[in-house]
């Protein structure tokens, strides 16, 4: 997690099975958390930003929102800049997304609307 609102997920692809993630907020200006979801294989980070943009604007997308197709996998607690946590996950093969919903005090918007979402593959 960084001040420019990005996640860096390594290695690529992430291996399947039980694992321990080191999650570090390398930034100094923003606190972040991680919401880890399994997502449909064809969904992109841009799709997720657009879907949540519709939901947060008060105009839900036509039909079922994309988030209804997500499967919650885990959470990494709120971290201030410069801190590291260790988190255990057991991941099956597929496509995943890490998303931050912390509100930016300057804009009043959640970080996801500023692009803080990364998709990755577990294989």
Task: Describe the predicted segments one by one.
Residues 18, 25-59:
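Contiguous segments within soluble domain cores/interaction surfaces
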Residues 51-77:
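Subset-of-secretome marker
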Residues 2-6, 11-16, 22-34, 70-123:
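Extracellular/periplasmic metallocenter environments
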């Amino acid at each position: 997690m960084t001040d420019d609102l990005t996640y860096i997920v390594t290695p690529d692809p992430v291996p399947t099975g039980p694992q321990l993630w080191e999650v570090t907020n390398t930034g100094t200006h923003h606190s972040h958390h991680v919401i880890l979801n399994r997502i449909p294989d064809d969904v992109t980070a841009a799709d997720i930003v657009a879907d949540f943009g519709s939901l947060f604007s008060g105009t839900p997308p036509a039909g079922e929102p994309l988030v209804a197709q997500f499967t919650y996998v885990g959470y990494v607690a709120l971290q201030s800049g410069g801190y590291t946590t260790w988190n255990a996950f057991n991941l099956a093969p597929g496509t995943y997304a890490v998303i931050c919903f912390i509100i930016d005090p300057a804009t009043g918007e959640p970080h996801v609307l500023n692009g803080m979402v990364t998709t990755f593959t577990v294989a």
